[in-house]
């Protein structure tokens, strides 16, 4: 079900609707800032939630939402700074998380997220400098990691054990020293497609 490009400012219209069988919900390119209603609804079969290109800054309602079957969460191009609620969110089926083009600097909460099925993590165009939490996270199924256009300087934590299944790694447009970059990248398995700095 798509409500994209309609100048919608809130999700309150969903309150009395029956979405028990709904699998895909799209509210892209609107002017939504408040998603608190998501914590009050029963989306027990929802698999995809698209909320990109809005003005959302507070994602704490995700912590109360029933998203056990959610596979895709796309909230890029918003105003998100704090992702700490992801530690508590019930997103055990998540395979794609897209938080590109926000104002995120601290990704520490990722180390405690239970995203055991996560295949694509996209965080490009934020303000991230420390990627250590990704090393500490249990993302063994991760295939694509986009970290381009951030403020990363140190990638020494990158190793094959972190990325057993990684196929694509994008670190372009960061502040990484070229010599150190080459040393680290050369140690990673050769079949990873790497987008150069």
Where are these regions (language model features)?
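Concave beta-strand-loop units of leucine-rich repeat
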Residues: 1-8, 21-32, 45-56, 69-79, ...
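A structural signal for leucine-rich repeat
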Residues: 12-19, 36-43, 59-67, 83-91, ...
């Amino acid at each position: 079900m798509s409500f994209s490009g309609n100048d919608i400012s809130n999700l309150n219209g969903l309150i009395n609707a029956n979405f028990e069988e709904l699998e895909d919900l799209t509210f892209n390119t609107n002017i939504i800032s408040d998603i608190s209603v998501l914590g009050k609804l029963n989306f027990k079969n929802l698999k995809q939630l698209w909320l990109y290109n809005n003005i959302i800054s507070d994602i704490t309602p995700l912590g109360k939402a029933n998203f056990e079957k959610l596979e895709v969460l796309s909230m890029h191009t918003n105003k998100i700074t704090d992702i700490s609620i992801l530690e508590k969110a019930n997103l055990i089926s998540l395979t794609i998380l897209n938080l590109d083009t926000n104002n995120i600097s601290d990704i520490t909460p990722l180390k405690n997220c239970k995203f055991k099925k996560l295949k694509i993590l996209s965080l490009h165009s934020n303000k991230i400098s420390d990627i250590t939490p990704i090393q500490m996270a249990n993302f063994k199924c991760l295939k694509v990691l986009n970290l381009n256009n951030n403020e990363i300087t140190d990638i020494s934590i990158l190793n094959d054990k972190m990325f057993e299944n990684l196929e694509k790694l994008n670190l372009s447009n960061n502040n990484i020293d070229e010599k150190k970059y080459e040393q680290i990248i050369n140690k990673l398995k050769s079949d990873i497609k790497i987008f150069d700095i």
